[in-house]
């Protein structure tokens, strides 16, 4: 149900990530997403965000790793430097539930534009809509969304309090 003019969109939550490194898989190269994922898995590097785009038999996309995993990922990134773009100091902002609501996407995109916030990647599912932006501006990104969207009473954007690491 679309809100009346002046009403805010109702959302259930906003999750902000810790500091991430975004790895963009560039189209038109011989380096595959499967190879990237296998290389990261072999180094026990978790990817908390993955989004892929397939068009005309070409695969492009982005994934994120924790900033503290960058040194362990460096050999993979250097070996595939022409096929990857690396963006450091990225964070993700996830709004839920999404439920394929175009008005929520519009709210987030226009909020980012009003504040001049970069959008490095967008990922969606029926449950959530995620934007990546500059890590140092995540709180500003949340404020931009909350100009047009409303959380339930006694809720605020949250960050993870702990992280599980594979050993």
Question: Where does each model-flagged region fall?
Answer:
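A conserved regulatory-domain signal marking ACT and ACT-like small-molecule sensing domains
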Residues: 1-167
